[in-house]
Regions:
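Metallo-beta-lactamase
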Residues: 30, 37, 137-170
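Divalent metal-coordination and catalytic microenvironments
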Residues: 10, 23, 34, 49, ...
Length: 170
């Protein structure tokens, strides 16, 4: 688990419970597509980056579910990276209490305030075409969550977040 898999020249992913995309910007800098489900995932991702001599410039979140943004806070504190999320996903990521509140229909009870529904806060900015590095484009994928997106790299690799599920998951 947390094995680095190279898919194309500049496109990788980390094999983990939620696949974490890596897009290599140059020989020493990368950006992530999502960050995993919690601080422990963030630590494991950081080890992979360090082992390859890569510095993290940005995280591009596909959507605001906790299993995709849970490593944000740890990685941002460790690296100072920027984090971007699309549309209303940015608000949910900046204010993670919104996800269990949305599911509950009001202020969530304690039983709904756990790491699987509520990630730690991170400082997130709105994702726009202007903040993307060269070679990365947004694919709009609303459905699973409000403003979910995927990304296509210049290697023609796509990161589709929760648009695809395994037979076992279904």
């Amino acid at each position: 688990m947390y094995e680095l898999i190279q898919v194309a020249e500049n496109s990788y992913y980390i094999q983990s419970p939620v696949k974490i995309g890596i897009f290599k910007l140059n020989e020493t800098e990368v950006c992530l597509i999502d960050s995993g489900n919690d601080k422990d995932a963030g630590k494991k991702v950081k080890k992979v980056l360090d082992a390859n001599g890569w510095s993290l410039k940005a995280i591009y979140n596909t959507h605001s579910n906790a299993d995709h943004i849970g490593g944000n806070q740890y990685l941002q504190k460790q690296t100072g990276c920027k984090i971007y999320s699309p549309g209303i996903e940015c608000d949910f990521t900046n204010h993670p209490i919104l996800e269990p509140a949305y599911l509950y229909g009001g202020y969530p009870p304690k039983d709904l305030k756990h790491k699987f529904l509520m990630a730690q806060e991170s400082k997130v900015e709105y994702l726009t075409e202007n903040v993307l590095p060269e070679g990365l484009e947004i694919i709009n994928l609303p459905g699973h969550f409000f403003d979910m997106v995927g990304f296509r790299t210049k290697d023609d690799v796509v990161y589709l977040a929760d648009c695809l599920s395994s037979k076992e998951t279904l």
